[in-house]
Amino acid sequence: MFKGDKPGKRIMITAGVHGDEQNGILTAQKLARELEGQSISGCITIVPTVNLSGIARHSRDFHSAAPDSSSANLNRVFPGNPNGDDASRYANSLWENLLKPNADLAIDLHSQTSGSAYPLYAFADYRLDDSIRMARLINPDVILNDPGDPGILETVYNRADIPSITIEVGIGRYTDLEMIQRATTGVQNVLKDYQLIEGDVVDLDPPCVEGERITSVRAEQGGFVICHVELMDLVEAGQKLATQYNSFGDEIQTYYSPIKATVISHNVESVRAPGSLVVRLID
């Protein structure tokens, strides 16, 4: 927690809600190091490792110590329930005692999950001016107009009248130093623009892709999938996206784009189970 000696906004920066999304964690840690010794107005709180049980297991989920409990997606149970299961109680304790009381604004740092990649990608509820403002200051490749879903930390913040965004910092599990630096610079832009720290906002690149609809192309069957597109490619309806092979290397499936859209995610691990993500599109 960085408490300023001058009045200002209180911003909460979280990471590690999903334990295998390490670029978000590394971004939060880097940001904290770079804030050391700076003049601060208001208060900046950084929680870099929300889901320690998942981080220890390289797992997306929250894992209970109780032998009769199943793992849970922590980012689907906020604000939690003090009388619920252990994941719900944990989320509620965090929300009521740390996350909500210390925030006028919030940024939740993630990455794509293991096996797939994202660009620098922001979720923002366009009904909230501060959410749009923060998302564009991040200088991402993509912004999704995201009204939110129940249980997601960003949504719970927004519904509590605390403007929030989610930032996806590239690939799942594996370290991407360039993406971490971009995300750190983006969060610093937010801090500067809201006058929590001194300095000028880094000039923004040309406008990013902003969309309202996500289309996910998923594996029809198990096998090995090779993608033929890259992140941020603009694809046409009917364009080939990926080819799938069986255990013997025989071609068994071809995947095509159902719409004209921009590629924002694709698998980076070839083994795909039925229903696993192959390519994700935004338009």
Question: Language-model features: where?
Answer:
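Structured catalytic-domain cores with a bias toward divalent-metal coordination
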Residues: 1-283
